[in-house]
Regions:
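Short amphipathic coiled-coil heptad-repeat segments
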Residues: 6-54, 236-267
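A short glycine-rich beta-alpha junction/loop motif
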Residues: 1-2, 150-160, 168-171, 186, ...
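Short, solvent-exposed loop/turn positions at domain surfaces
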Residues: 78, 116, 193, 236-239
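Short, flexible loop/hinge motifs at secondary-structure junctions
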Residues: 27, 33-36, 40-41, 47-59, ...
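Short, ligand-facing micro-motifs at secondary-structure edges
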Residues: 97-110, 130-155, 171-175, 184-190, ...
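Non-catalytic DNA-recognition/assembly elements of restriction-modification systems
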Residues: 1-8, 38, 55-76, 206, ...
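Sequence-specific dsDNA recognition surfaces
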Residues: 68-81, 95-127, 144
Length: 303
């Protein structure tokens, strides 16, 4: 009984520590999300490269431009229905594009003519915007196609492809349209039709872009990638730690059942384990008293 009490106390203490640790770890992804948003915000308002500009021989200025002025092309896609059977050319799904990312493994297939293929096939450096989506948070998001994985890769009609002039790096423009201020501006253009939320090519062209010189764009891209890689490393470490914490509860309970939580206590209290004060001795004493009590009752009945 004494050992059971010690086990219960240790379990309460250890499991409370596990819950507290888990709660702190679970807050970190949200903190990292805010960190990434702050990085994107600083990237497009000049704060991220503010000190860097002090060492530049020429004064760097962020120009306010309509997106249309740095476009060589903004093209809607084919409206033909894709298939799942693998016939034709690979085509992205609308879900392939998320803010700052294009998943080239999220594909279906589409049969089209040679001329349609030439007009709509993608290449490295293409920017893709989601034109329609059932979820507001995914409307107007921008992803950059990097390291093309499929030959003759196409995009569906709910995406819009953008190609840029030499004045703008596609990596910087992806960062810009993923920033909180640009996302808010894009949201102001969203309209709902038949349950689908969407924007038009005209809406995208009219977006105001803050554009520094190409050299500073490259520095912004480098710093954002560096800071995001740092955040990704932390997130991976946190996820690994959370997985271990989630296994701790079962591990602690298993140790409790095996008596490992109270090994030191048993070493310090041998009399409660095997002496006259132990649980085993107490049980034997109770059995003896019950036997004696039963014997007396039986003898009285015979007389």
């Amino acid at each position: 009984l004494a050992e059971q009490k010690i086990i219960a106390e240790k379990l309460d203490t250890l499991l409370a520590q596990v819950d507290s640790t888990k709660a702190r770890f679970e807050q970190i992804p949200q903190i990292l999300k805010r960190f990434r948003q702050a990085v994107l915000g600083g990237a497009v308002n000049g704060k991220l490269t503010e000190k860097w500009r002090n060492f530049e021989p020429q004064h760097s200025v962020f120009k306010k431009l309509n997106f249309e002025s740095i476009l060589t092309e903004l093209r809607n896609a084919l409206s033909s229905k894709p298939n799942e059977s693998g016939v034709g050319h690979p085509i992205l799904r609308i879900s392939s594009v998320r803010a700052g990312h294009v998943d080239q493994n999220d594909i279906r297939f589409l049969e089209c003519s040679e001329s349609e293929l030439n007009r709509h096939k993608l290449q490295d450096g293409d920017l893709l915007f989601t034109r329609y989506n059932g979820s507001l948070e995914f409307v107007g998001v921008c992803g950059l196609l990097k390291k093309l994985q499929h030959q003759n890769l196409l995009y569906p009609d709910k995406l819009i492809r953008a190609r840029l002039t030499k004045d703008a790096l596609p990596e910087y423009i992806e960062i810009f349209f993923s920033s909180p201020s640009a996302r808010n501006a894009m949201m102001n253009c969203v309209k709902t039709t038949s349950g689908q939320k969407g924007i038009s090519g005209k809406d995208i062209k009219s977006q105001v872009v803050l554009l520094p010189p190409v050299k500073e764009q490259a520095e912004i891209v480098r710093r954002v990638e560096q800071l995001f890689a740092y955040a990704d490393t932390i997130e991976k470490q946190v996820n690994n730690a959370l997985a271990r914490v989630n296994n701790l509860t079962q591990s602690i309970l298993a140790k409790a059942f095996r008596g490992e939580l109270t090994a030191q206590w048993r070493a310090e209290n041998p009399d409660l384990i095997s002496g006259e004060n132990s649980a085993a001795a107490l049980l034997e004493k109770i059995k003896a008293e019950r036997a004696a009590s039963g014997g007396k009752k039986a003898s009285r009945k015979k007389s």
